[in-house]
């Protein structure tokens, strides 16, 4: 009986070519596993394609709700953003995928897991750190790094290899954008984006969105509710988190929200440029932050921001299954105990504008914030506070004055 390998399978040219290569090189039975994180129509026809390519079995695993509830929500609650712009769409999905690959490998008694990530990107790190953290005994095969036995260097090479092994599928040899899509976002790399001096060709590029210039000329108001930091409804309709994200994607895409063009620092040391569409995610981050502003005290908000930056780095680097990520998430969850309320905002040509926030746990006090005199706040108290708060500055200034006098 042959040993088994679980292949992270997308149905694209790369992973299709890997199937006969694994059989030929290692004499494995190949169990393909396509993890559905919300990529939608990209899954059409996969079963037939995997069978024609020589796979022994195909799993199509729907983890959309797991992805939304256990990976997206913690990052939203933390407000984790990598390098101030990237909302971690691909980064969050990789540990969720790695976890399910390990579960299938255990179920099939597979000796190895194979992925098709290249040797220059971040995904190889994210997949392999996730797999290693959960199953250190399982072998990992990364064909694109095995240049002594993986000899295909272009799409043309892969198409020829497939045809030589009886796989004649309608793959296009011409290069196109490299895309990654899931419930949260879609990323675009390649073609004109490889030169940062080029403006993206948005007419050909965008999939989920329209540009702000082509968005409707009329603003649209949206109301959302949260309970303990978890989104619960849109415009009065309660939904599970994944459906809320889908609805926000529809609304945000319509109004040109969440299109970013960034040059980011990859884990492996090089810079890469990409255009990301994250319409729903951008709205969800903004709505959650809008509510938090009303509820969190200053000290907690300051520390939470520090934790958010660290969490974003951990997620980006593939360190989801680590004690530090768990500790940061536990802290963030504790801050969400009272993040309950309703936010209203309007969407207009790429912008999100606040239009009102309410919460039973609001720390905002109109009587304190106004300029009228109240029972809780005596304006005279500010004098003593300012004297103490500015004492270090006063001591330093007096010291410098004395030094200057002594030097004359």
Question: Where are the regions a protein language model picked out?
Answer:
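Nucleotide-activated chemistry modules centered on ATP-dependent adenylation/adenylyltransferase
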Residues: 2-408
């Amino acid at each position: 009986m042959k040993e088994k390998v679980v292949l992270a399978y997308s149905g694209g040219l790369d992973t299709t070519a890997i199937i006969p290569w694994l059989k030929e090189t290692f004499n494995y039975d190949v169990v393909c596993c396509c993890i559905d994180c919300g990529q939608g129509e990209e899954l059409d026809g996969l079963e037939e394609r995997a069978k024609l390519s020589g796979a022994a079995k195909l799993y199509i695993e729907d983890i959309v709700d797991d992805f939304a509830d256990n990976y997206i929500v913690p990052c939203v609650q933390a407000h984790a953003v990598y390098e101030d712009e990237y909302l971690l769409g691909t980064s969050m999905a990789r540990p969720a995928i790695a976890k399910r690959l390990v579960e299938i490998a255990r179920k099939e008694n597979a000796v190895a897991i194979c992925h098709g990530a290249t040797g220059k990107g971040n995904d190889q790190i994210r997949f392999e750190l996730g797999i290693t953290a959960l199953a250190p005994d399982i072998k990992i095969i990364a064909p694109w790094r095995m240049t002594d036995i993986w000899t295909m260097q272009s799409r043309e090479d892969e198409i020829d290899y497939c045809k030589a092994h009886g796989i004649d599928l309608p793959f296009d040899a011409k290069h196109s954008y490299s895309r990654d899509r899931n419930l949260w976002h879609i990323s675009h790399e390649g073609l004109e984006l490889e030169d940062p001096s080029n403006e993206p060709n948005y007419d050909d590029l965008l999939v989920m969105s329209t540009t702000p210039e082509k968005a409707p000329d009329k603003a649209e108001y949206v109301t959302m509710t949260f309970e303990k930091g978890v989104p619960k409804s849109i415009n009065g309709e309660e939904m599970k988190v994944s459906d809320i994200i889908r609805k926000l994607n529809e609304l945000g895409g319509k109004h040109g929200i969440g299109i970013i063009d960034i040059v980011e620092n990859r884990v492996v040391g090089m810079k890469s440029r990409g255009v990301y569409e994250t319409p729903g995610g951008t709205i969800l981050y903004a709505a959650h932050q809008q509510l938090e502003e009303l509820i969190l005290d200053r000290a907690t908000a300051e520390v939470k921001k520090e934790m958010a930056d660290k969490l974003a780095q951990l997620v980006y680097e593939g360190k989801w299954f680590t004690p530090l990520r768990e500790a940061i998430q536990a802290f963030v969850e504790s801050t969400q105990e009272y993040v309950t309320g309703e936010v209203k905002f309007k969407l207009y040509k790429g912008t999100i504008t606040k239009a009102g926030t309410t919460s039973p746990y609001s720390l905002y006090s109109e009587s304190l914030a106004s300029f009228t005199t109240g029972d809780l706040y005596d304006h005279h108290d500010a004098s003593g506070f300012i004297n103490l708060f500015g004492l270090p500055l006063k001591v330093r200034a007096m010291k410098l004055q004395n030094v200057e006098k002594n030097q004359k």
